[in-house]
Structures are given as structure tokens and as C-alpha cells.
Amino acid sequence: MYVGALHPDLADPVADAFAGVLPELSGVAGDRAAAVRFGKRWQAHRGGQATETRGTRLHKLTEFTPLTAGAGHPRLMTSAEIDLVAGWARDGFPEELGSQRREWAERQLEQQTMWIWEVGGVPVCMVGCRVPLFGVSRVGPVYTPPEWRRRGFAGALTSQVSAGIVAGGNQACLYTDLDNATSNKIYRRIGYRPVADFVDVVLG
């Protein structure tokens, strides 16, 4: 169940309402304060545990600062890189796309929403973005193969993609893993600032 940005004070009455009609509820996701409070209230009704698991943080670009890398340049993905992008998606976030990785990569090509950082003719990193909706575009996914990490490529490419979003008259946002201090630090250097934390709470 997704509670979104529900005000924490409303979490209790919402949990009260669902406890009697949806006893099989296995989890809740949304704003951290609301989801955690919902979980505690659910425990009071149904017993069991309410365990906070995956946490993400929403960031908004407020003051843009460009980042650069020691080598390479950004460009859009090409049709010859559909399998490459699909393979990187498999390696970087295997649970999110399942068997639809190639179709997803083809869609990025069609929408021109996947960027590649290239060094000496070799693709070393990818950063995507969403088609703007209501003036907002979300940056991601971001993936660098292990052998090309710690060289500033992801930060530089994220910076370039973010700049393009802003140049198009849209706002840029992105999500990060709460436990990934490195990426949170890099995005802060670009000018992203936290807006809200979201978590999954497993009920059982």
C-alpha cells in the first residue's frame, strides 16, 4: 500500500480504517514519517512486526553547479547500444525491469532520454531521465560498470543531464538510496537538495 506524502497525523486514522478491512496487508510505502507511524499503528491493531526496509530520498535541483571529469564527453545513446544499455540495466538494477530490459532500452532510444559518457570511443557510463511531466523531469537511472567507477564519470554525466533539463525550462529531481553516502555527496555538489525521505515498511 502506498501512502505517498500523507501527513503523519493522518497515518493513525488511515491505519485504523484499513486494519479491519484489509488484514492481509503486507506492507506500506511512502513518506518516512507517515509510513513508520502507520506501521506502529498497524502493530497495535494486528500485532506482528513493522520493519523499515528500503529507504530513498527525493532531491530537487536548486542551485546548479557543473561537474566535469578528467576525460570524455556526453552524448545520446545510439541504436547500436540498445543491447549495451539493456545489459547495464541488468547489471545495475536487475529486479526493476525483469525481462523487459531490451524494450526499456528501445524506449530510451526513441524518447532520447538516455545519455552516455564516452572516453576514447568507449561508453563508460549511462544516465537517463524521464520525459518531463508537469514541468518536472526525474534523473535516473545512473549506472557505471565497476571497472570505470571512481573517475567522476557518473557525476559529470548527471551534471550534464541535469543542465539539459533546466535548459529546457523544467525542474530536475532525482531519488537516491539513503544508505549510499557517496552518491548523496556527489548530487549535493551538483546542487541537489533533499526534499523528503521515503521508506518501505514490511508488516507481518
Q: Positions of the model-derived regions?
A:
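Acyl-donor-binding surface of acyltransferase catalytic domains
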Residues: M1-A71, V201
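Recognition helices and adjacent regulatory flanks at domain boundaries
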Residues: I116-E118, C129-P132, R151-G164, Q171, ...
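Conserved GNAT acetyl-CoA-binding A-motif
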Residues: L22-R32, I165-T176
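Conserved acetyl-CoA-binding loop of GNAT-fold acetyltransferases
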Residues: A44-A50, R188-D197
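Conserved acetyl-CoA-binding loop-helix of GNAT-fold acetyltransferases
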Residues: P8-A17, G140, T144-P146, R150-A167, ...
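Short amphipathic alpha-helix that is part of the acyltransferase structural core
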Residues: F64-L97
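A conserved beta-strand-loop-helix scaffold within acyl/acetyltransferase catalytic domains
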Residues: L97-Y143
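Conserved beta-strand-loop-alpha-helix junction that forms the acyl-donor binding cleft
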Residues: A29-A35, L174-N184, V201-G204
